[in-house]
């Protein structure tokens, strides 16, 4: 399918990589302030410093939990995690386990902000990992072929692999459920992440439930087409409602027989990862009307010069 810049919908892959490899808790706090990846830092091979901004160009200068950082889609937190990883390579390896070819992922720190062109199919396929206990299962479109006598002459076989440790995956599911904010008429567990790109040209939303994963992109066929403001052009306003309405309509359709008792899989025993972050939240930072935030990845088209 057509590939477009995915924006903040890519951030959960950066978070997942850090939690999976470094064992960082969603409750660990990070400073919402300018972060610079400089020449000589890690294996980024930059030739000049890179200091991306939040969408508003403002910083709270407050300590935010990882969980809150994802909900508020703070670019600063995502870049901090990328710097912590020391290289884009761990993230590229992670998404490769989720079905996205490494050839599509630039070897650049700006992938932390979603400076990547991918298709809705590729993104939705990768997000199924979160809804499936960290297991990526290759999407298939044709289940089987039968001849005119009803005899099966072809049956598809979908490969699968464990991309995320179950404990790390459940932490991500918990964070995505927290991040979703407004959920419309959808009943039962749901999580998700919005995405908005430069000049408000692309709006994304990836939604996960125990039964179904739905992804959508909204934008113009030509990249120069954009909405005139972030308020109108953010994924939370133009892409997310489509997914919520679609899932709600499926739940209301008796023919679908939606399983309202289904829950995201939680590994048995102790997770070893703290998820209850209430004691760490800063009560002085207000939510907007629907509890959502969208920090679009500004200036990511102005890439730093990279070495060979």
Task: Locate each region found by the language model.
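Conserved catalytic neighborhood of penicillin-recognizing serine enzymes
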Residues: 24-91, 136, 148-178
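Active-site-proximal helix/loop microenvironment
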Residues: 97-153, 157, 163, 191-199, ...
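Active-site Gly/Thr loop motif
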Residues: 170-197
């Amino acid at each position: 399918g057509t590939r477009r810049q995915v924006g903040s919908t890519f951030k959960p892959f950066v978070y997942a990589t850090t939690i999976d490899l470094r064992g960082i808790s969603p409750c660990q706090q990070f400073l919402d302030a300018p972060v610079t990846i400089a020449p000589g830092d890690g294996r980024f091979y930059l030739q000049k410093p890179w200091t991306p901004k939040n969408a508003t160009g403002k910083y709270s200068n407050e300590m935010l939990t990882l969980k809150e950082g994802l909900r508020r889609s703070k670019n600063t937190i995502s870049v901090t995690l990328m710097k912590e990883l020391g290289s884009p390579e761990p993230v590229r390896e992670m998404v490769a386990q989720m079905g996205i070819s490494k050839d599509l992922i630039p070897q650049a720190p700006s992938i932390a902000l979603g400076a990547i062109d991918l298709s809705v199919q590729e993104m939705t396929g990768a997000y199924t990992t979160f809804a499936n206990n960290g297991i990526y299962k290759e999407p298939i479109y044709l289940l089987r072929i039968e001849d005119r006598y009803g005899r099966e002459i072809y049956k598809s076989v979908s490969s699968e692999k464990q991309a995320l440790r179950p404990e790390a995956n459940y932490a991500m599911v918990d964070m995505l459920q927290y991040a979703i904010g407004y959920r419309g008429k959808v009943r039962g567990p749901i999580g998700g992440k919005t995405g908005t790109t430069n000049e408000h040209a692309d709006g994304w939303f990836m939604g996960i439930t125990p039964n179904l994963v739905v992804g959508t992109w909204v934008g113009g066929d030509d990249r120069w087409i954009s909405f005139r403001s972030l308020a109108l052009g953010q994924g939370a306003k133009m892409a997310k409602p489509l997914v919520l309405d679609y899932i709600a309509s499926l739940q209301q359709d008796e023919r679908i027989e939606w399983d309202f008792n289904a829950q995201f899989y939680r590994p048995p025993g102790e997770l070893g990862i703290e998820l209850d972050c209430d004691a760490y939240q800063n009560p002085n930072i207000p939510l907007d009307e629907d509890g959502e935030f969208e920090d679009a990845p500004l200036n990511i088209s102005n890439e730093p010069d990279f070495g060979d």
